[in-house]
Amino acid sequence: MNETREEQLLSAGRTVEAEKKTDVEALKKKYAASEEKVYTVVTTVQVDDETENEFTFLFKKPKAASYDRYVKTMSNSVTKASKSFTFDNIIDEQRDMLRDTVEEYPAITISIADKLLRMLGLADTTSVKKL
């Protein structure tokens, strides 16, 4: 009986994941047709040694005002700055999904903010050479 219940739970989980992927694909199509620059950000959270959760979000390209708020807030709290910056730029349809994800994995906003900053030109490597 436990195996049957476990199979039902796994099946329900797969159904939910399939629905999420369908929703993301529909949103991608919607925003691909618009003038707005929207990017897909996929992040994987390692829950434990055997489990990983993958999340896919769509973000608008950050505007200068959003970046300025991020830099201003960073001096007080990197966590708050990353969270605000991430929520500033998520598409409206995924705001609740992001909120739920952040409740469970609060550090995810730091990873996402890093990717958003790279859209604005943050580089891993910058070199200087004396002439």
Locate each region found by the language model.
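Short, surface-exposed, charged amphipathic helix/loop patches that serve as local interaction elements
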Residues: T51-L131
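Short, charged/polar N-terminal "headpieces" of proteins
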Residues: M1-K61, K130-L131
